[in-house]
């Protein structure tokens, strides 16, 4: 079961004006300098979507899947197998979806809060098999307040939801999201405060530690590991323009810089660069906890308002390399069109309408599927695109 920031094979459907999408399959549940950390009630839930949230719970013969898609005005939840619309939930704002960590709930970020969406599919392990359940999808009012919602990351049995406007992140145990088979009415959280507000992230590590970005509202300069009180344990300041992170095998993590990437494992940071390209930003990455390889974008035009990259990179977290590969001339991709396949394949949905499949070990293109017509990227990052 997924409990980390690996990226699944999913795309948004630009023809419908959709903003973001996330697929969830019912599987067994369960799955940074001076600051302070205090336990709190954190989140509470009232009577929202009452009819849906109290819908019957049905046991099925096998696992079900749900596909949640945001649009300008709400969230639509579909059956992941036959694409039947199950629920159209109204919610204002520019909405983004995140994994809530328990393989049942999603987090809906609207800029000022993280609200929990019950997709209505889950399973319970029972000896050598599992029991599978479904109910109607519903948006609870169980939420976390956040000044400028940003990255939400689940790993090592915890979830950290970052607030860019305050430089704080709330941590919770995803096992506590359910009570009596329904979304819990309260959620205990612990808040960790970093020195300065910034567009950052926090990755839960073992031993109640967190891998975080370091910076302020103007610049981001590196990464650090902090404890539950926000105290720095170790730090690396050699990562200008920090953006993007991914989880790889063996509790290894990659962090994007404007001149390369940082690889973190077992208390040690390693900087990886490509000297032929002094400016080489890999600010978006797609990893999986089952693979040592991380797919990353590769941008080399420092002055471009919008660079449409025609190269991509694969980071080897064991060999400490970032290999660069070229797409056909005139073909590019965006931060939304990167993913990983069921066996760790590197996936790119490119502007020629193809889903390209690569072997991450050597960058070989294994094949492609023509999914749509050619398309181009909008200069407004919030606009929908494949």
Regions found by a protein language model. Name each.
Residues 214-342:
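Acidic, serine/threonine- and glycine-rich low-complexity intrinsically disordered segments
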Residues 86-93, 124-145, 179-199, 233-238, ...:
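Beta-propeller fold detector
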Residues 51-59, 91-104, 138-157, 191-206, ...:
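Repeated scaffold domains used in trafficking and secretory/extracellular systems
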Residues 23-26:
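C-terminal motif of bacterial Sec signal peptides marking the signal peptidase cleavage site
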Residues 28-31:
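Bacterial signal peptide processing site
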Residues 59, 63-71, 103-110, 114-115, ...:
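Short beta-strand elements that form the blades of beta-propeller/WD-repeat-like
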Residues 130-256:
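Long, acidic/polar, low-complexity amphipathic helices and coiled-coil-like
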Residues 72-169, 178:
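Post-signal peptide N-terminal segment of secreted/secretory-pathway proteins
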């Amino acid at each position: 079961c997924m409990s980390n920031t690996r990226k699944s094979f999913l795309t948004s459907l630009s023809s419908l004006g959709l903003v973001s999408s996330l697929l969830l399959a019912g599987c067994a549940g369960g799955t940074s300098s001076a600051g302070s950390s205090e336990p709190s009630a954190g989140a509470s839930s009232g009577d929202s979507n009452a009819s849906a949230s109290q819908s019957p719970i049905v046991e099925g013969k096998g696992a079900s899947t749900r596909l949640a898609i945001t649009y300008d005005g709400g969230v639509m939840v579909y059956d992941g197998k036959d694409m039947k619309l199950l629920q159209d939930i109204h919610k204002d704002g520019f909405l983004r979806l995140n994994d809530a960590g328990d393989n049942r709930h999603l987090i809906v970020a609207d800029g000022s809060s993280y609200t929990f969406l019950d997709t209505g599919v889950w399973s319970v392990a029972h000896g050598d098999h599992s029991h599978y359940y479904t109910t109607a999808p519903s948006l609870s009012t169980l939420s976390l307040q956040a000044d400028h919602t940003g990255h939400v990351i689940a790993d090592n049995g915890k979830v950290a939801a970052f607030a860019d406007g305050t430089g704080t992140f709330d941590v919770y145990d995803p096992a506590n999201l359910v009570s009596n088979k329904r979304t819990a009415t309260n959620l205990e959280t612990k808040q960790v405060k970093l020195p300065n507000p910034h567009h950052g992230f926090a990755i839960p590590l073992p031993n109640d530690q967190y891998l975080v970005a370091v910076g302020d509202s103007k610049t981001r300069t590196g990464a650090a590991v902090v404890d539950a009180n926000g105290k720095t344990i170790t730090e690396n300041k050699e990562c200008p323009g920090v953006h993007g992170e991914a989880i790889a095998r063996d509790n290894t993590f990659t962090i994007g810089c404007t001149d390369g990437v940082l690889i973190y494992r077992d208390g040690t940071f390693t900087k990886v660069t490509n000297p032929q390209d002094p400016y080489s930003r890999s600010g978006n990455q797609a990893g999986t906890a089952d693979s040592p390889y991380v797919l990353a974008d590769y941008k080399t035009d420092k002055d471009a308002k919008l660079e449409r990259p025609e190269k991509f990179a694969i980071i080897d977290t064991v060999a400490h390399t970032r290999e660069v590969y070229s797409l056909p001339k005139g073909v590019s991709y965006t931060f939304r069109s990167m993913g990983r396949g069921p066996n760790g394949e590197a996936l790119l949905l490119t502007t020629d309408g193809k889903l390209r499949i690569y072997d991450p070990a050597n960058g070989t293109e294994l094949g492609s599927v023509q999914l749509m017509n050619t398309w181009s990227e909008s200069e407004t990052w919030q606009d929908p695109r494949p």
